[in-house]
Swiss-Prot record:
3-methyl-2-oxobutanoate binds at D44, S45, D83, K113. It comes from Clostridium botulinum (strain Langeland / NCTC 10281 / Type F). Its EC number is 2.1.2.11. Homodecamer; pentamer of dimers. Mg(2+) binds at D44, D83, E115. This is 3-methyl-2-oxobutanoate hydroxymethyltransferase.
Length: 275
């Protein structure tokens, strides 16, 4: 049975942790979905881990719709959330609703995510009014990397911490069904999670959130450009891939692959007539 926004709320209400990962293509989405994950975020992080950009700012709506369609086709259980890219909702409330609608209508997503606190409350209200579930995102919001001066922990002083608590409450009031808390101190995420009734999903926000999300390339050691402090490696798939490719190259060079069992047959009578 497909997870829904109601599933997320039910899990929080009974104290069971929510599990999420990113995915960007059909084959990986299918693997993750079959593992029993509650939700998959088609994150604009694809700009960095799939497209090689320095940050997420260059990702377009067309990029996001293309990848979201593939992920949806690979799932039957997970709630699929489409990440609204930079400048797809900041320009106007009309654009926010229109682009959120494209994720649902064209890509088949079940919800959208957008970054920001009080500044995006009206956009969230309008999107929810259009019957589209919204996941909020506060703390380190990568689309604001130039304002933050880099990828830095947020909420370490009283002023910013209080604002994050207030932002979470505002997002709940605006109609968000859950909120991602990224790169904020663990004890602050505990206060936020206890201050609102909707689920919090942490990434670099400690153990007190109602759920967790990671970029799958990070948690499987597939992305070597950098490794955030908050990431734990749950498998060294990157090395396994390199080992497999190296072995393939070796066997091709040495004419050990393909073997007879990998080849298709033809009758000798037919072959003899070809000479």
């Amino acid at each position: 049975m497909r997870n829904t926004v109601s599933t997320f709320q039910e899990l929080k209400n009974k104290g069971e942790k929510i599990t999420m990962l990113t995915a960007y293509d059909y084959s990986m989405a299918k693997l993750i979905d079959s593992s029993g994950i509650n939700g998959i975020l088609v994150g604009d992080s694809l700009g960095m881990v799939c497209l090689g950009y320095e940050n997420t700012l260059s990702v377009t709506m067309e990029d996001m719709l293309h990848h979201t369609k593939a992920v949806v086709r690979g799932t039957s259980n997970a709630l699929v959330v489409g990440d609204m890219p930079f400048m797809s909702y900041q320009t106007s409330i009309y654009d926010a609703v229109y682009n959120a609608g494209r994720f649902i209508k064209e890509a088949g997503a079940h919800a959208v995510k957008l970054e920001g606190g009080a500044t995006v409350a009206e956009e969230i209200k309008a999107i929810v009014k259009a019957q589209i579930p919204v996941m909020g995102h506060i703390g380190l919001t990568p689309q604001s990397v130039n304002m933050f001066g880099g990828f830095k922990v947020q909420g370490k002083n009283e002023k910013v911490a209080k604002k994050l608590i207030e932002d979470a409450k505002i997002l709940e009031e605006a109609g968000a069904f859950s909120i991602v808390l990224e790169c904020i101190p663990e004890k602050l995420s505990k206060i936020i999670s206890e201050s609102i009734s909707i689920p919090t999903i942490g990434i670099g926000a400690g153990k007190y959130c109602d759920g967790q999300i990671l970029v799958y390339q990070d948690m499987l050691s597939m992305f070597s450009d950098f490794k955030p402090k908050f990431v734990k490696s749950f498998g060294n798939i990157g090395e396994s891939i390199k080992d497999g490719v190296s072995q393939y190259i070796k066997e091709v060079k040495e004419a050990k692959f393909p073997e007879e069992k990998h080849a298709f047959k033809i009758d000798d009578d037919v072959i003899n007539k070809l000479y």
